[in-house]
């Protein structure tokens, strides 16, 4: 279990073997008031992504597990008007991202992950770029019907990257894989409180 608390917040992440329970509360979360959440993650797939990624710097590494397509059940309540978001395990999913390591001080890491249903079957993906020496290993995976399928190289085509001092992150991105198994377009949405 992991627990952290401060003056205006507390978060508890419980590992109950066949489920994970997240309980969080934060006063003054945003302009509309406080946040309270209790979400339970269940139905852990038999296969997940586990990786130990080296860095070029000696004795630096990242050990990570991603569990996609876990069913989510619970509520998040936010604001003075108690706006409540309910997660139904029939159609709500989560990814559990657990990692440890010795990281280099300066990093650039792009990460994408999703879980949901395609034709009534659980489907998810995990892609990563730029964190550690990914020529040795990558975290690129597809998840379908509880099985993990390894992807090799996934290229992140970042708008304006490669010629501009600052990439234009709000323009559409595209992703391609060397084997043609993962092709995706993504248009960013910026929503800040």
Could you say what each language-model-derived stretch is?
Residues 1-193:
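Structured soluble/peripheral alpha/beta segments that form catalytic or ligand/cofactor-binding pockets
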């Amino acid at each position: 279990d992991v627990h952290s608390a401060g003056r205006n917040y507390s978060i508890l992440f419980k590992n109950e073997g066949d489920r994970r329970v997240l309980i969080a509360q934060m006063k003054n979360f945003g302009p509309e008031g406080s946040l309270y959440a209790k979400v339970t993650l269940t139905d852990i797939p038999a296969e997940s992504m586990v990786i130990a990624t080296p860095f070029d710097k000696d004795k630096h590494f990242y050990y990570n597990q991603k569990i996609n397509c876990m069913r989510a059940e619970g509520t998040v309540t936010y604001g003075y008007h108690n706006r409540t978001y309910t997660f139904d395990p029939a159609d709500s999913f989560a990814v559990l991202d657990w990692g440890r390591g010795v990281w280099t001080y300066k990093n650039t890491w792009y990460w994408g992950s999703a879980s949901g249903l395609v034709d009534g079957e659980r489907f998810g993906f995990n892609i990563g770029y730029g964190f550690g020496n990914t020529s040795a290993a990558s975290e690129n995976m597809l998840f379908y019907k509880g099985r993990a399928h390894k992807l090799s190289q996934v290229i992140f085509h970042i708008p304006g990257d490669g010629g501009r001092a600052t990439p234009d992150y709000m323009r559409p991105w595209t992703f391609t894989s060397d084997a043609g198994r993962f092709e995706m377009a993504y248009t960013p949405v910026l929503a800040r409180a």
